[in-house]
Amino acid sequence: MDKEKNIQAVVSETEILHESSVNFLKIFEAYRVEKKISTRKLVQGLMSDRAFLDIKKGNYILAKSDWEFLMQRMGIVTEYFETIVSRKELEDWRIREDICLLILENQSEAKKRLEQYRSKCLKEKKEIPKIQNQFCMKITWLLSKSVLTAEELYDLSCKAVACTVAEEKWQEKLTTLYLGPAELETTLLTVWSLYLLGKTTKALELYWKIKCYPKDYEWEPRMQQMIIPQIAWLGMKLYQRLHMDDEALKVGENALELLRDQSSQRYVYPILQELISLEEMYGKEYKRIQQLKKFKVAFENVYEANKLPCMRMWQCSSIKNSYDVSLILKRMRYSMEKTQSEVCTDENGIPFLSIKQLSRSD
């Protein structure tokens, strides 16, 4: 058979990303219907009903990170799905990852990278998108913890939550809202701020709602491990200060067990650090303490060998099984044995892309 007859028309990057977005929409709708959740409740705070309708009609492409955010609000783990993403989205993820790696051990460099990321977002759009802005405000809170007053930290944490949560009385209505791990992580900053304000009872009430949220909404363990360690770490700090030592140990040990079951290292180092400190303080079993110390040293060795910090933040978004669309196009061009000039011209001989633009993606 003539090889030319088997060659499909070259598709553009936009078409591939559009198809990827459509596939995510199908998965999203299937889960939404199965869980009997209204679209309005899931997109609330992130976009309007009309904007989501445009996406359903195919008039607008939603990025993989946005779909991931919406899926996580339903408690769905998205790292299992293979997706095609733009190079820009991969670059944005890597910049955020750099900030996460720096934030706890090199704050001056983290601050510099944060400003660069903000500037990059503002160059591309008139304002920073809601999900990205929430990330920036979380980092700002952590950078400002030793500088701002408790009241200012509380206001900043509430503004960070409001980036994606439209409900003004979210603290009272938390259990009725559909939130993902990144949003719950932001609400923990409000708990911390309330405690610093001396509002201990209110802080504990909110903390308890957040702690129960993943199980109340029946998140699978793989999703729970994205937020339980942060909940546990803050819980250990709060319970210690309130002299609730047994609760502090319990919440830490439960988090460690979850991480072990999921073969996850998210925040495992600070959890181990706190548990060792607690168990030594209260004279717990010697063998248990030695075992925890052994785990801690093992992680230190692994991180040192890979030149990674022991103390870091972790993103709730993932690029696992995500493929760069420009590389997909490049491979398609090679497999079809077409030149750059041929790829940049449609069937009528009209160029729709410059060779210079294609070279950038190649």
Mark where each language-model region is.
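Amphipathic alpha-helical segments of tetratricopeptide repeats
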Residues: E115-K123, C158-K169, W208-W219, E253-R260, ...
